[in-house]
Amino acid sequence: MEKYADLLKGVDGDLMNPKRFMIVTLLYTLGPMSVRELRRALGVTWGDLDSNVRRLVEKGYVKLWKGLGSGPRVLEVKIGLTELGEAEYERLVAKLRELLNSLERRSA
């Protein structure tokens, strides 16, 4: 079993957090969006989103900026992945795929 644990060594535990993983997954697949859109897509409270986004900003994985909005709002806060965030997400997904492939080979 140690072999499987070794596959995830070096992976940032902050990205393994389910909500942070979903935030980064949505930004990776859909691209930058407004914080309001992200909150709706995740179905989380503002407080929950804020604490998780703050942690991702601290790690340098996402960035926030004000941009033109659609509808009645002229400006809204946008969120997107940084280059570091994209790289770390890709590394995490590769490690998870490697782990799943290893487990599938073992069960076959």
Question: Where are the regions that the model predicts?
Answer:
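Amphipathic alpha-helical dimerization/coiled-coil segments
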Residues: 2-6, 26, 83-108
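Short alpha-helix boundary/capping elements
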Residues: 31-32, 53, 61
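Short amphipathic alpha-helical interaction segments
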Residues: 44-58
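A short, conserved structural fragment
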Residues: 60-67
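Basic, amphipathic "hinge/linker" alpha-helix immediately C-terminal to the N-terminal HTH DNA-binding motif
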Residues: 69-91
